[in-house]
Amino acid sequence: MHLSSSLLFTSALLAGGINASPATNAYRRQGADMRTIIGDTTPVLSNTTAVHFPGSGDFFSVTERWDVYRPPSYQAAITPTTEADIVSLVKMAKQHNIPFLATGGRHGYGTSLGKCQEGLAIDLSHFKDVKIDKQRETVTIGPGVVFADVFPVVSDAGYQVQTGTCSCVGMIGATIGAGIGRLDGVHGLVIDALESVRMITANGDIVEASKTKNPELFWGIRGAGANFGIITQATYKMHKSMGDIISFDLIYEPEQNVTLFNTVANMYLPPGLTVETIMSYNQTTEKPTIIVSSTYAGGSEAEARRWMQPLLRLNPWYKDIKAIPWKRMSKETALGLDKEVCANSQVFDIYGVNLRRHDANTWVKTFNKLAKFWNEQPAAQSSSVVLETWPNQAVVAVPDSETAYPWRDATTYVMIQMRWDAPGNPVETVADAMGRELRNDFAKTSGYNGLTVYVNYAHGDETPEQMYGRNKLHRLAKLKKQYDPSSVFGFHNPLPTSYP
């Protein structure tokens, strides 16, 4: 969940790039003028495809990002309206060595995306179809679809499907990094619902991947999918609706931090219960605060209250408990801050950490460091730390070998969000240093052998092993070499083409 100025919220987007060494250097295109190249390509594009250059009316609207911390930059943006047009654009970019990002929700924030400079934006916002197949109990979507588009269509058909937490994130982009969310314990990761994809490769070929078609590619897509191509269609298995979600929004005094963190760290979570703990600064009370946003799926409010007793008996000073339809879960949980969180052009300097061990002392130390930081750096008081403690019963029920995603045993995903008002604020240096320090603290007591990170929460400075897992990298590198040997799709937490 990414937090806004007072609080909140999650994920990665479908992205690609062209770079011989994307992990180390920003790539700027050199050679023929991009306007000329695009002009030469335009005759093969459909007449509904739109081309935008900086200064034109729609250029900003099709390139504006959620996070403006170390962003990519573009010489042009193109909004294709057919799959064939996307193929033509990929071939054009590869032929002329043009770096590009193919964007859906434009919600990705890893700093590796910022290595794409003066490139091409392939805006996939036209591809917004959400189609239900009740007979097969599936939903098929395009790359322009965000979670907010999926909720009402799936819910009104009588189903639910795994999603992320924030409504404005691109569903396919979040999926291909694994996709974590509030139904993890019941149904598993979002990739566990994925049945098939249709993808354009670096050569401009269209391939399909599933457990029966190109199964090795399908394995890699489920956890590292941004590295292999542009997904133009994805189909997911739906689940019969479990009814309303029970939501708990609780706020605690800062003095309760030791008791609260020990309670959360030692609390049993049944499959339907999630606990999100948010350390933030309250601008109204002018003091640190701790927010807990919990949800319970698959049971009654009375049942949910029984499971939540360890937290309720701590007597939070604010308490809002209610049943909400699943389709409004993103918008009405976590104090209803989804709209504020989803505002574009904000600064989010994000660091992520996986935990499989809950060390309450580390959480207490983090809160105390933040309290001191907020007091000394008022320009960064919108910074926060979010701990998403999701039950993982259904996640670990899927064999580790089934997908490329390596961290199924994680029990909490930490998102450290360092924030300030606008790019260029001098507080950036000290805020970024604090983010790194907190990440290191969590990693030391995480229960893993060093830092590991859910790739959708990666900052961009992590090693491939820390994102993709040492035991998965040899197989992933072989796939990368097979489908994208020149790293055309190399700006979103890129894979190597050989390992070790």
Swiss-Prot record:
A GO term, aspect molecular function: FAD binding
Keywords: FAD, Flavoprotein, Glycoprotein, Oxidoreductase, Signal
UniProt xrefs under Pfam families: BBE, FAD_binding_4
Leader sequence segment: 1-20
The protein's required cofactors: FAD
Alphabetized InterPro entries for the sequence: BBE (IPR012951), FAD-bd_PCMH (IPR016166), FAD-bd_PCMH-like_sf (IPR036318), FAD-bd_PCMH_sub2 (IPR016169), FAD-linked_Oxidoreductase (IPR050416), Oxid_FAD_bind_N (IPR006094)
FAD-binding PCMH-type domain sequence ranges: 69-241
Induction summary: Expression is up-regulated during sexual development. Expression is also up-regulated during confrontation with the arthropod fungivore Drosophila melanogaster.
Enzyme Commission identifier(s): 1.1.1.-
Top-level lineage group: Eukaryota
Gene3D superfamilies for this protein: 3.30.465.10, 3.40.462.20
Glycan-modified residues: N47, N257, N282
SUPFAM superfamilies given in the database record: FAD-binding/transporter-associated domain-like
Top-level EC class as recorded in UniProt: oxidoreductase
Similarity-based family: Belongs to the oxygen-dependent FAD-linked oxidoreductase family.
Function description: FAD-linked oxidoreductase; part of the gene cluster that mediates the biosynthesis of sordarial, a salicylic aldehyde structurally related to the phytotoxin pyriculol. The most interesting aspect of this pathway is formation of an aromatic product from the highly reducing polyketide synthase srdA. SrdA synthesizes a reduced polyketide chain from one molecule of acetyl-CoA and five molecules of malonyl-CoA. The polyketide chain is then reductively released as an aldehyde.
Protein's recorded name: FAD-linked oxidoreductase srdI
